[in-house]
Design a protein with these regions (language model features):
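Active-site proximal helix-loop segment of RNase H-like, two-metal nucleases, encompassing DDE(D)
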Residues: 52-58
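A short, polar/charged loop-to-alpha-helix boundary motif
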Residues: 169-184
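A short acidic/small-residue loop/turn micro-motif
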Residues: 43, 167-169
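Protein kinase glycine-rich loop
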Residues: 49
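Accessory "access/gating" subregions that flank catalytic or transport cores
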Residues: 1-40, 116, 125, 138-139, ...
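General structural feature for long, well-ordered alpha-helical segments within catalytic domains
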Residues: 1, 11-14, 26, 46, ...
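Internal maturation/activation junctions in enzymes
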Residues: 8, 58-165, 175-176
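Fold-independent oxyanion-binding glycine-rich loops
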Residues: 38-40, 155, 163-165, 183-184
Length: 184
């Protein structure tokens, strides 16, 4: 919305005409706790999956090394599912009930992979018969997703660094008053 000194393409009319979509929170259990987070299109459900998988991967009285490996594996499994099944709920049906079900999480925690391998998404058909005919396709766009980091040092040795994690590189690619707008 900033117009000077570096005007962008976002206008005050864009902000005025923006329609907020309120979505209910989603919740899931982790041991004696109840985790509540944002619903899709945000990735909050992935955090519930991570904790559900971690609980199943992490044996009682495990060593620190085992706990850390369990947490990393839980994240990798949950994000493989997130990348495959999540999206904009206005456009696709996201099978959250199945992805967060105790039966699916228990079975998913048994999926093993080498540290150098990228885990694949899980198979939901055993947990929800209505999913059997549904096909999800991988994202084939050339866009790179992730965090953007810049480090700049000028001729006088002054340094500045910026890290932005807003879904894709530079988010919407719109700069407003010192930050990039998220494209999620």
């Amino acid at each position: 919305a900033a117009r000077a000194p570096n005007p962008g393409s976002l206008s005050l009319d864009d902000l005025k005409n923006y329609q907020v979509k309120e979505r209910p929170v989603i919740c899931g259990p982790y041991r004696v706790f109840k985790i509540c987070t944002t619903a899709p299109p945000s990735s909050g459900a992935a955090q519930i999956m991570v904790m559900g998988l971690y609980d199943r991967l992490n044996p009682d009285n495990a060593s620190l090394e085992t706990r850390l490996q369990s947490f990393v594996d839980a994240q990798r499994l949950a994000y493989a599912d997130r990348d495959h099944f999540f999206g904009d709920p206005d456009e696709i049906n996201i099978p959250l009930d199945t992805l967060l079900s105790p039966g699916y999480l228990k079975a998913r925690a048994l999926d093993r992979f080498e540290p150098s391998e990228k885990p694949t998404h899980g198979d939901l058909t055993a947990y929800d018969a209505s999913i059997s005919g549904v096909q999800w396709a991988p994202d084939t766009t050339d866009e790179m997703a992730g965090t953007t980091h810049l480090s700049i040092i000028d001729f006088e040795g002054n340094a500045v660094a910026m890290t932005a994690t807003v879904e894709g590189p530079f988010g919407t690619q719109r700069w407003a008053k010192g930050f990039f707008l998220n494209n999620e």
